[in-house]
Each structure stands twice: as structure tokens, then as C-alpha cells.
């Protein structure tokens, strides 16, 4: 026998907010979703991605284990 009332309530028009601004409407099990990052403000998707590597991994390893490059 199948259990009754085990599924969550589905909200077909759940609102997604980022910084208090309505971003989109989706289907969800919660009526409102508040996000910090979404594709509209993420650096990877907006093209403002910067790679910050002040110290290379090899140099860091060499310095950490006090080794010299050959």
C-alpha cells in the first residue's frame, strides 16, 4: 500500500531573489528562494573572471619544502 501525504508541496511559481531583486520564477518545493550568486552576477558568466594566482603552485611547493630549482 502506498503511503499518503509523503510528497512535499510543489510551488510552480516560486520566486528567486538575489539582493532583494526578483530574478526569475521557477518550480520548487519552497515558495521563495534567496540566493547570493546566480548566472547574471557570477564572474564566470559575466566575462569579468580574473585568475588571481599571486604565487605559482610549483614555487609555493619549492619554498614550502625549502627546495631549489634545478
UniProtKB/Swiss-Prot annotation:
Q: Which UniProt keywords apply?
A: Chloroplast, Plastid, Ribonucleoprotein, Ribosomal protein, RNA-binding, rRNA-binding
InterPro entries recorded for this chain? Ribosomal_bL28/bL31-like_sf, Ribosomal_bL31, Ribosomal_bL31_A, Ribosomal_bL31_sf
Indicate where this protein resides in the cell.
Plastid, Chloroplast
A single GO molecular-function term is: structural constituent of ribosome
One Pfam family named in its UniProt record: Ribosomal_L31
Q: Summarize the subunit comment.
A: Part of the 50S ribosomal subunit.
Q: What is this protein called?
A: Large ribosomal subunit protein bL31c
Which species is listed as the source? Answer: Porphyra purpurea (Red seaweed)
